[in-house]
Amino acid sequence: VYGCGVLLLLSSMFRQALLIRRLRRHSTQERIGRIVLVRPTAQIASFSFFRTIYISRSVAEKDIAAIFAHEKSHVIHRHSLERIVMESLKALLWWNPFAWLAARALTEVEEFEADRDVLAEGHDTGNYLKTIFTQQFGYSPDVADSLSNSLTNSLTKKRIQMMTTPMKSRYALLRLIAMLPIVTGLLAAF
């Protein structure tokens, strides 16, 4: 049973890598410095994989700069490598709920870090929030009647909260670093 779980998750990772490769092969590509921008005709959520950024041609021109900055942050911080390591650990520890929680927490931290970098580049917070909303839900928040139902318990809601509330403590990063040994110990215990 354990081996089947590991094999299933690792084969899923391999399948995703093949899909990314096929998407890149069937899309237009442009080199921007050390980064390759891939513009597929398929309507996909924007993402990066190592030094390659994928942004659908259906994305509005006004949103491309902020999305590119966000994905460039993922490239600079090597989040693809972190993700592969975490997904591999999750495959090996698939039965451990803490592995799944750690993977979700890593995703949140990576998104918060990328959002921080986008805002540090000088992108307008309000416009960037609209871009995130449009990317996540496929329509502009100007058209939405209520955000509360759509955003309940979502990563998008947490990202919006992180960008719109001031930092509560200088020591937030220190607290996060202090949590690493605890999380590592919990993962090792199971």
Specify the residue positions occupied by each region the protein language model found.
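Hydrophobic topogenic segments
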Residues: 1-190
